[in-house]
Amino acid sequence: MYGKKNIEGGKLMEESLYSFENFSHEQALILGVKAQQIVKEENLKAVGIRIVYKDLLVFQYLMDGKKEDNWLKRKAKTVLDSGHSSYYVYCHQEDYQTWIDDESYSICGGGYPIIENGQCVGAICISGLKHGDDHELIVRILKEMEDAR
């Protein structure tokens, strides 16, 4: 059985596995489309997908039934301000106490850092599934992209 600290450590290791020498807008498009395809093929709930890179919104898609992107924005802010996945922040809440009641942050899974040359330069966000499933979908897509390289 995994404790909170084991999950937290695993999320940090996971972040180091999926990084980029050079991320591009083209990769953002590939990531976003892949996420949409998986959700559709597996008949999952409708999701919103948002990818921010170097302060630019480079991809956003709200599937039919999604009307707001506020959770996506909150997850992106959580990632960009922490430098970690929003799931890591969720597991490590004691260090982010001031964010818990701040509605500009989202203390749950579904936001993932774009790490380029060791620096967090963006965020990949999915919202609409259970928060752990949002996180795992992002990791799955990043793993598939890594395996294809």
Predicted regions and their residues:
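Flexible, solvent-exposed loop/hinge segments and secondary-structure transition points
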Residues: 1-115, 119-146
